[in-house]
Amino acid sequence: MSRLRIYDDTRPESPLLDTQDGAVIAAELQKIGVTFERWQATAPVAPGASQEEVFAAYRADIDRLVAERGFKSVDVASIAPDNPNRAELRKKFLDEHFHKEDEVRFFVAGSGLFTLHVGDKVYEIECVKDDLIAVPDGTTHWFDMGDEPSFVAIRFFTEPDGWVGHFTGTDIAQKFPRYVPTQAS
């Protein structure tokens, strides 16, 4: 189940809010310009599935979102727990960074933890199958897929290099706990 925890950015041990209520998650994130929606991931795909398999399964959803929002590029992040590069892939986005365009992800299998740093608050969003999240450009954040990553997310971009992270150099991400999935997805 999706989960949101909000913290003061100096108190990682004490959440100000901890909820699994989708309506509350969406409302709280909307306050900071983040879109959170529950969609239906209707075609079964397993973590580690190829981009071609995921595109074939979700072509109608992809085409609709591209048409609605003007995306120019789409790819798939699909990582299974047995991926030999999982530690390297996990480390890639564990430090605070931002993108120069909106970061839009639709989780069609598994889970991962987006952590946003906005003002003096930290928002941990556990995204699971059926979650669509859109993080506005310039929002500082990090992403943790866990020790044994298991997820498939369709990623949407307005520019081909939109996925490139611009790192802030702060150590705030190390002050917050690493991701341990709360459910099997």
Swiss-Prot record:
HAMAP family xref list: Salvage_MtnD
Summary of subunit composition and partner proteins: Monomer.
Sites annotated May play a role in transmitting local conformational changes: 102
GO MF annotation list: acireductone dioxygenase (Ni2+-requiring) activity; acireductone dioxygenase [iron(II)-requiring] activity; iron ion binding; nickel cation binding
Binding residue positions for Ni(2+): 97, 99, 103, 141
Role this protein plays: Catalyzes 2 different reactions between oxygen and the acireductone 1,2-dihydroxy-3-keto-5-methylthiopentene (DHK-MTPene) depending upon the metal bound in the active site. Fe-containing acireductone dioxygenase (Fe-ARD) produces formate and 2-keto-4-methylthiobutyrate (KMTB), the alpha-ketoacid precursor of methionine in the methionine recycle pathway. Ni-containing acireductone dioxygenase (Ni-ARD) produces methylthiopropionate, carbon monoxide and formate, and does not lie on the methionine recycle pathway.
Pathways involved: Amino-acid biosynthesis; L-methionine biosynthesis via salvage pathway; L-methionine from S-methyl-5-thio-alpha-D-ribose 1-phosphate: step 5/6
Cofactor: Fe(2+); Ni(2+)
Key words, A-Z: Amino-acid biosynthesis, Dioxygenase, Iron, Metal-binding, Methionine biosynthesis, Nickel, Oxidoreductase
Source species of the chain: Stenotrophomonas maltophilia (strain K279a)
Cofactor note: Binds 1 Fe(2+) cation per monomer.
Record-listed Fe(2+) binding positions: 97, 99, 103, 141
Enzyme class: oxidoreductase
Protein's gene: mtnD
InterPro entries: ARD, ARD_bac, RmlC-like_jellyroll, RmlC_Cupin_sf
Superkingdom, natural source: Bacteria
Keyword Electron transport annotated: no
GO biological process: L-methionine salvage from methylthioadenosine; L-methionine salvage from S-adenosylmethionine
Enzyme Commission (EC) number: 1.13.11.54, 1.13.11.53
Protein name as it appears in the record: Acireductone dioxygenase
Catalytic activity: 1,2-dihydroxy-5-(methylsulfanyl)pent-1-en-3-one + O2 = 3-(methylsulfanyl)propanoate + CO + formate + 2 H(+); 1,2-dihydroxy-5-(methylsulfanyl)pent-1-en-3-one + O2 = 4-methylsulfanyl-2-oxobutanoate + formate + 2 H(+)
PANTHER family, sorted: ACIREDUCTONE DIOXYGENASE (PTHR23418:SF0)
Pfam families found in the cross-reference section: ARD
Residues flagged as site, May play a role in metal incorporation in vivo: 96
Positions bearing the site annotation: Important to generate the dianion: 105
Family: Belongs to the acireductone dioxygenase (ARD) family.
UniProt keyword Amino-acid biosynthesis present: yes
SUPFAM superfamilies: RmlC-like cupins (SSF51182)
